[in-house]
Amino acid sequence: MKKLHKFFALLTSALLTNAHASEYYSFVASSEFMAPKILQSFDLELDFLGEQDEQRAAIESSAQYFLKRFENSYTFIPIIRNMIAQEGLPQEFLFVAMVESEFIINAQSSKRASGIWQFMPNTAKSLGLEINDYIDERKDLIKSTRAALGYLKFLYEQTGQQWYLAVMAYNCGYGRLLKAIEQADGDTSLNTLLDEEKQYLPPETRNYIRKIVAMSLVFNDADFLKNNNLEYLLNRGATDTLATLKLKSGVPLGLVANSIGLSLNELKKYNMHFKYAFLPPGPADKEYNVYIPYEKLSLFRQNFDTNYKPNSAFILHKVQKGETLTSISRQYKTTINELKRVNGLKNSFLSINQKLVIPILKT
């Protein structure tokens, strides 16, 4: 139950920034005030409330499911909240990420969308996110959130400054939204665009906006919170929980982990954008963002050698037919054990086109 309290306290506090606890409680408790305020955040009319009954019921019945899915997200949510506030977007847009990925940093869809904001590769690259053999910044919490919020602001301007249109364009694409509006004879009202018979928009998009608004309403509904013994909520401050390090290419993540007393696997949870346990190779002056728990920052400053220079570089080798770890180790003048260690291999079996990281000693 403590986790449930913590989870809902965090989610409901997402609609406030820098609020005192007493102000927060009265704000949430006034359900008559909350619903219009939330709808206004999406530029929606009050009559849209009638659309939400089914979605709200489904979400309310799945409270435990959401708890289990998001209990590892406490580190990320305050960061997203802060960034939303800094960009001047409605705080309800936290729930866009919830619907997109359930706050799973490495979420991957069957259509190749990835990350907490579920960017497709081409969209991500157009927004300045780097994707290559070594890194996928769609899984970088900070950079992907900045890109998503910037993209939503762009869509807001393109759609005539209507947030509900921007949200739907984020899901189905701006071009697809324009086509729907054209088919509706230029009518941009939500009731028209969500028409179940005319089906101007794909079913996924019609449900998408409903889910986001419903979640905003549910997790700020005083009766729902009271019925779940969650009426006493502590407003968790919108403080950053991760510190950003600027480290140069080639640095092993294991060194960073050791300097702050974390396991490599624990550090990777905050840095899923790196595909391997080292920073991508590249120019000596290129830097990458590495994230650590904020409370570990002083340890890092004490223990990490900022003048560290890797004594080896890394390249990728694609396994060809007939190759073995023995032949590859000989080709690159390394050892089988080193190849296993760097690539996390538990045995010597390889598959064609498998990518292996090869450490190359610098001369």
Where are these regions (language model features)?
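Sec-dependent signal peptide recognition
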Residues: K3-L10
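Hydrophobic h-region of N-terminal signal peptides that target proteins for export
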Residues: T12-H20
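Substrate-binding clefts and substrate-entry loops adjacent to catalytic sites
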Residues: R56-K68, F103-S110, Q118-Q161, L165, ...
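Short, functionally critical alpha-helical segments immediately adjacent to catalytic or ligand/cofactor-binding
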Residues: L89-N106, A166-N171, K268-N271, L339-N343, ...
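Catalytic cores of secreted or luminal carbohydrate-active enzymes
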Residues: P203-L225, E295
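Primarily a LysM-type cell-wall glycan-binding module
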Residues: Y232-L264, K309-K333, K346, S351-K355
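Extracellular LysM carbohydrate-binding repeats and other cell-envelope/extracellular binding modules
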Residues: N271-T306, T335-T363
